[in-house]
Amino acid sequence: MSELRDTRLEKAQALIECGQVPYALRFEPSHRTAELQQAHADLPNGEERDVSVAIAGRVMTRRVMGKLAFFTLADETGPIQLFLEKAALGDAFKQITSLVDAGDWIGVKGTLRRTDRGELSVKAAQWQMLSKSLQPLPDKWHGLADVEKRYRQRYLDLIVSPDTRDTFRRRAQLVSGIRRWLDERDFLEIETPVLQSEPGGADARPFETHHNALDLPLTLRIATELHLKRLVVGGFERVYELGRIFRNEGVSTRHNPEFTSVEIYQAFADYNDMMDLTEELISSVTQQVCGSTLINYQGTEINLAPGWRRATMHELVKEATGLDFAGFSSREDAAAAMEAKGLQTPALADSVGRLLNEAFEQAVEETLIQPTFVTDYPVEISPLARSHRSKPGLVERFELFIVGREHGNAFSELTDPVDQRQRLEAQQERRAAGDLEAQRVDEDFLNALEVGMPPTGGLGIGIDRLVMLLTDSPSIRDVIAFPLLKPESRDGSAAVDNGSTE
């Protein structure tokens, strides 16, 4: 590798001696390659078209055959062939064939011709080095076989893998589609703080940092919920934020400590309205991104057209296990029944409601393949959700499950400041008992609720998991451009990172 780099450095020096700049300031393409392919699809084989074009891109392949050479040049939209002829280029032919390597960025001006084999080509009249590559490209046929290297050196993955490029194009389309859908319905996006003195809005451990000038301990946000609710208190009736969230938790194929979510709040709505909104939003952006609401994920056909199943947590657990948690009067009774079914009963699950959630996670969650709204959660695990209007001990909450994974979480929001204080104080007691993911008491948020918050529906959707679904990606690392990885060791070799801490 070091010899190859030295050779390319020598070529960069030779370019300077020929009057070329190895790293140009600018170049002005007249077209992108896909535009040329489309606009001149009618050019017959073996014919030329006297139209001046200027294109720029990375040299992907090169073939030199005496007085002729053929390069493949690729820009963001795709490849096109360069036809290089000594008779047309003169001395520049020797320069481009001897000093340009696969991986270099070049600009070319010329006309168009289609080869006898039907390949649209730019017949070069002039060329310019734009950026001399000192490192070779990965093998064009096998790409990056090392999965970890794909994540660690994403730039190489993007160069050689059209599928990877398509994944991130679809991600961008999804994000812009969500924003457009919400904006068209009068939702206003407002940024909330990333650095917070009191993290809240989720059961999660935060990343901790310190503000030196203020000598103030801070955390990165674990949710946007509590600040967006403050905005509703302030009079914004439809508000959302799409952005980064940070949780100091394990890493797996479905978890990354830094991830993207959208949280949406609508005044005068409840969790039923948010179910309708979720269904309409996801089906709409799926149609935009995939061209259909019928998609394939890891060999399974998923139908995201509206009309998703809705079922309570109690119903689903009873259906899967035969256990009716409505009939248990104590934790001991529920635990004994679960253990008889072979289900685990962890000590932190210290109530019937928490055991119900355990039974759901162990016996039901992974079976929910088609989109399913799971509704009416235990109050113990939902400290920010409103108590159910007709079911004591439950709250008006749903989670959306698709392919066995949670994709959304929503409530009829708790707007009673007295009830909210009691819930958060109970969470604080759990923290003191060792539950480091339990929520904290946020006095300013409670003060905002005392000012008065209208009835509100709230929703959070994980963007990364939705991108996984719509791009048929098995791991969250496939849809995050630069996922968190263990650093390389000091000798330059990669520390082994199997992608999981679970």
Curated annotation (Swiss-Prot):
Alphabetized Pfam families for the sequence: tRNA-synt_2, tRNA_anti-codon
Cofactor note: Binds 3 Mg(2+) ions per subunit.
Reaction(s) catalysed by this chain's protein: tRNA(Lys) + L-lysine + ATP = L-lysyl-tRNA(Lys) + AMP + diphosphate
Major localisation: cytoplasm
Gene Ontology cellular component list: cytosol
EC number: 6.1.1.6
Cofactors named for this entry: Mg(2+)
Top-tier EC class: ligase
Superkingdom of origin organism: Bacteria
Positions that bind Mg(2+) 2: E406
Cellular compartments annotated: Cytoplasm
Swiss-Prot/TrEMBL keywords: Aminoacyl-tRNA synthetase, ATP-binding, Cytoplasm, Ligase, Magnesium, Metal-binding, Nucleotide-binding, Protein biosynthesis
Alphabetized GO MF terms: ATP binding; lysine-tRNA ligase activity; magnesium ion binding; tRNA binding
UniProt GO BP: lysyl-tRNA aminoacylation
Binding site for Mg(2+) 1: E399, E406
Family, similarity comment: Belongs to the class-II aminoacyl-tRNA synthetase family.
Subunit structure: Homodimer.
Designated name of the protein: Lysine--tRNA ligase
Record organism: Synechococcus sp. (strain RCC307)
This protein's encoding gene: lysS
